[in-house]
Amino acid sequence: MSAEVEEDHRPSPSSIASFSSFEGEKSIRAFSLNPSFDDSESLSSRHTEDPPDFFDPNYANDITWLEDDSPYPEVRSAVANYDDQSMPINTLRAWVLGILWAIIIPGVNEFYYFRYPSIMVTGIVAQLISFPLGRAWARWIPQWKVFGMALNPGMFTIKEHVLITIMAGVGAQSAYATEIIAVQRVWYKQNFNFGYQWMLVMSTQLIGFSVGGLARRLLVAPASMIWPNTLVLCALFNTLHSQSYAGIGRHDGLSRERFFAYAFVSAAVWYIVPGYLFQALSYHSGMGFSLLSFDWNQIAFIGSPLATPWWAEANVIVGFLVFYWFLAPLVYFTNVWCSQYMPISALGPYDNTGKRRPYNLTRILNADSTFDLQAYKDYSPLFLSATFAISYGLAFASITATIVHAILYFRKPIAVHLHRSLAEQPDIHARLMSKYPPVPQWWYAGILVVTFTFSCLCIKLYPTQMTIWALFVALCIALVYLIPVGMIQAITNRQVGLNVITELVVGYMLPGRPVAMMMFKTWGYITMSQAMIFTSDFKLGHYMKIPPRPMFWCQVVATVVAGTVQLGVENWMFANIPLICTPAQKDMSGFTCPNTEVFATASVVFGVIGPTLQFSKGQLYYPLLFFFIIGAVCPLAVWLLTKRYPNSWLNYVNLMFTGVGLIPPASAVNYVPWAMIGFLSQYVIRRRYFPFWAKYNCNLDVLSAALDAGTAISTLLVYFILQYPRNGAIGRDTIQQWWGNTVFKNTADWHSAPLRVVPPGDRFGYVWHCLFFGEICSAAPHSV
């Protein structure tokens, strides 16, 4: 017999009453999702804590710290403050559905990763679709047992749902190490076997988990570490399992499932217009002054604008306006860094003839892929476009700004939480989670030993020019930045990347070794980044009261499955898609590999040529090193001003440098429409209609997930039905040639045309005493 479908009677955050139980205390209290609800009764009987020891832009200053709930309105509106420890979680159903999503979503995302514009299918898609799948499983699967495990454990619970979603999302992003493999294959003509590829991906993806375990006390337990992205998932979990509707009241409106279905179908149908029939609605080039894009691929290229607080989005867009709409044109039209001989915005390197594709690496490399200095002098220095050069300066600034910001704002909370256990946290969620046994430290140590062994095997068994001692240095960099970066991300939903600082360090340590440079960067940067994913998921489990041990294993297993699938997809693509990662794909299916090209350019700048010939004193890009000083001074200046004006808007200034870190491969086209939608949803609606926003904000998250999923599926269908067959010949003389599909290709920006053209046989160059501003370049025969 099959189990009848049962409603999940776990009360939702919008219930009239809830029970909380901890340390022998049992109480019933009324509460509501409505932020205007008066929750001040019996405050005298509650233990109160002081507000955070730093300015927290998410903190509700007008509300006393509540013992049985969070002081953050976003958390109170999305997270329930009780737990049912008897609820099934570690079931066969959860593992089967979770593994299924750990195969599908990473595979789809890896396919899109090499395309422009790309799109990322997030775990919210799995979260939404798993709900009807889980309920169908409860209804139709027989109640048998296999090896002592129930095929059908009964009703589909919210905790099972959380476990499935975590497995779907933990490996959803393209594994960073697959970039190393792609660059080795395309740029350095190295194609090592699958064993090397698998060990490299597993070591870089999992070693961060062992490090992330160290951060739980500081980044998960404190209430101030809200992790805004997890609240999106929490709100949707509670909405789905409480059977709430998209409209007002229980039956006045569409159900979440139907709302998602309508939005999904609409997005899938609409994408055919900008994605195939009228591509001028999608593709733009240059600096993005056209403002609008009608393609969700372009709008969400840097992430959904519906899940980040407006004050953080405002920081990002102000940084974009200052550095890319003001500074970049100023640099370009004054010909700083010889930039007029290149497009204002480009992803790759140029030589001194103004030709970029490709910068001829074979002319400056020895047979073992190491750097030949004399050949480099005989050939050409490496030049970058104005926006690419500025992006390095901003990356330098973000590194020092992160450390200084953490010292100024987070030193007190770090000291407090280092000495505080889960049970001692003044947050109800931490005290509830203290009832579950923690993950043993030797589990983290075991992952570290295995992944470190894989790393050493990759270094010793294959000709990568990497060293074991350099691996230690890379891991130390990740450890140093783990807490500062984590605290910033937990509050702002923006992560500070360590890719450039690791590139700079290894460039000086191991000059002339491009593959070693890419490996060092990946272990130094992705160790920290994966630790953030691990920690973010643990915060989701913290909010949803998931025991830590099942959380740990579902993340590890799903990461192994996802990484293996992504390697399979990548190898298939390079074997079956013609001219992949070449300029010819720009006019075919779009598989130009923009992310990979940026990765390869960095390997040339920092790995082949090295920072000594690019950024040291007397070199062309030496002025960019002053951004390290700028990054250190700016947070200090803002901090001093906030001491003088404690209630001013300056308290919200903190993301100017790192917010635009996705340029390149992103461009202005991706930032402007993203900011416009973010302003509407996170400022206008939230500020003017806060009760409405608090109650229905997760509808925007459902909409975002539906747009992601519908666009992704439609893109796949368009590609495999209309573009992949016959090598793209379908409609070549008809639909592909009409004005709406060609007009955007008739611009100088699209053709990467520079402002100045080097005459045939001439070269441009620079003088040794180059200044940050001024005419330092000239075109003359062999004038390098």
Regions found by a protein language model. Give the residues of each.
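Alpha-helical multipass membrane-protein architecture
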Residues: 2-784
